[in-house]
């Protein structure tokens, strides 16, 4: 039987430096008999030569479009918004299963071309637990940025400036500690932070960043399902300086915060980091903004407030790219056992479940989306 060919595409999302495959996992796949083609990429945190040394074949950027149909296309974030049908099996995050804006157009490209989406967000084991996720580093980066925005707001009237990725965690934390020191000098105290979803991967990452930045336990309110069971909005959020939302959303729940709950004279809340960033989802429990932010413009102000301090929202949907090397290594390591079964993915439980979900979602597409 011919070896299975994996084609790692270059990411097109602005400032996305992460990679679903790393040189380390590429070497393991090649050792197991796979052929790995890697598109050259000026953005990827790993140099092209690192993949070449691991045994991969370097191919031109965007060459996946013309790759043989049987090649499996591996990527990370969503494809560019184009209209041509997709013929391959694609392994990636597509962000089209939770009725996000434009989901029909994104999803319909696969059945229109005879292709298949195996969405990384929904790869689960037999217990329904995700086999690999960027949650920890998303929470870590989100909480780190939230601390920097809090300090910035106290000392500047203009919006928080753009940020770039860091070579490692130590460099990020050094910057955050410096910012917190400046914030404390202005506020006269350390910030109080509430993290909702604190027991999961994302929330534990957020709490880890807060502690490494010098925020003591007594200033961190770490909530999970038990604490939110009574239903919001929650005064504890507006009493905190920073709110980091780390919940994984699958259905509508009572709002954690809304415009009405923010209109209180004693509001302390200055920064919301919505790590979940389900900005356009009808399920969002943080319906106080409608704009997805970027590393170029990390915050969006909450308009319409009549009292209290300014309030900024961070809603970057690829926060782990702030720490691209560490985030990629951790994710790809966790994904590797599943990647090693791609040569028989139809009969591998993890991939078969992803295919079943794809089929279910395709069945909900309006006929008009399939006719383009």
Curated annotation (Swiss-Prot):
CDD domains: SDH
List of catalytic residues: 77 (proton acceptor), 95 (proton donor)
TM annotation in the entry: none
Record-listed NAD(+) binding positions: 129, 200-201, 224, 228, 248, 275, 316-319
EC number: 1.5.1.7
Coiled coil: none
GO terms of biological process kind: lysine biosynthetic process via aminoadipic acid; protein import into peroxisome matrix
One Pfam family named in its UniProt record: AlaDh_PNT_N
GO cellular component assignments: cytoplasm
InterPro entries: AASS (IPR051168), AlaDH/PNT_N (IPR007886), AlaDH/PNT_NAD(H)-bd (IPR007698), Lys1 (IPR027281), NAD(P)-bd_dom_sf (IPR036291)
Catalytic activity, reaction form: L-saccharopine + NAD(+) + H2O = L-lysine + 2-oxoglutarate + NADH + H(+)
Signal peptide (residue range): none
Binding of L-saccharopine, residues: 18, 77, 100, 130, 134, 276-278
Family: Belongs to the AlaDH/PNT family.
Protein name: Saccharopine dehydrogenase [NAD(+), L-lysine-forming]
Keywords tagged on the record: Amino-acid biosynthesis, Disulfide bond, Lysine biosynthesis, NAD, Oxidoreductase
GO molecular function: mRNA binding; saccharopine dehydrogenase (NAD+, L-lysine-forming) activity; saccharopine dehydrogenase activity
């Amino acid at each position: 039987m011919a070896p299975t060919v994996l084609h790692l595409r270059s990411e097109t999302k602005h400032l996305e430096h992460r990679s679903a495959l790393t040189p380390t996992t590429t070497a393991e796949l090649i050792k197991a008999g796979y052929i790995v083609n890697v598109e050259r990429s000026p953005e990827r945190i790993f140099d092209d030569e690192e993949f070449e040394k691991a045994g991969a074949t370097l191919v031109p950027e965007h060459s996946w479009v013309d790759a043989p149909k049987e090649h499996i296309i591996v990527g990370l974030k969503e494809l560019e918004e184009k209209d041509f049908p997709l013929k391959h099996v694609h392994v990636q995050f597509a962000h089209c299963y939770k009725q996000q804006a434009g989901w029909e157009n994104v999803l319909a490209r696969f059945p229109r071309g005879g292709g298949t989406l195996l969405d990384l967000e929904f790869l689960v084991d037999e217990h329904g637990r995700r086999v690999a996720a960027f949650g920890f580093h998303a929470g870590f980066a989100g909480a780190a940025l939230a601390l920097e925005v809090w300090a910035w707001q106290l000392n500047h009237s203009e919006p928080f400036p753009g940020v770039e990725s860091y070579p490692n965690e130590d460099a990020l934390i050094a910057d955050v500690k410096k910012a917190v020191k400046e914030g404390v000098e202005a506020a006269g105290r350390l910030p109080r932070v509430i993290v909702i979803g604190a027991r999961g991967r994302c929330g534990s990452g957020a709490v880890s960043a807060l502690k490494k930045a010098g925020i003591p336990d007594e200033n961190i309110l770490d909530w999970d399902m038990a604490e939110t069971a009574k239903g919001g909005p929650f005064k504890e959020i507006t009493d905190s300086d920073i709110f980091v939302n780390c919940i994984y959303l699958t259905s509508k729940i009572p709002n954690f915060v809304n415009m009405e709950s923010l209109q209180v004279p004693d509001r302390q809340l200055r920064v919301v980091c919505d790590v979940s960033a389900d900005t356009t989802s009808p399920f969002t429990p943080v319906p106080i903004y409608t704009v997805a932010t970027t590393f170029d413009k990390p915050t969006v102000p909450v308009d319409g407030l009549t009292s209290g301090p300014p309030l900024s929202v961070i809603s970057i949907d690829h926060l782990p790219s702030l720490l691209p090397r560490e985030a990629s290594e951790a994710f790809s390591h966790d994904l590797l056992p599943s990647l090693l079964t791609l040569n028989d993915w139809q009969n591998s439980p993890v991939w078969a479940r992803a295919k079943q979900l794809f089929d279910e979602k395709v069945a909900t597409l309006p006929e008009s989306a399939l006719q383009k």
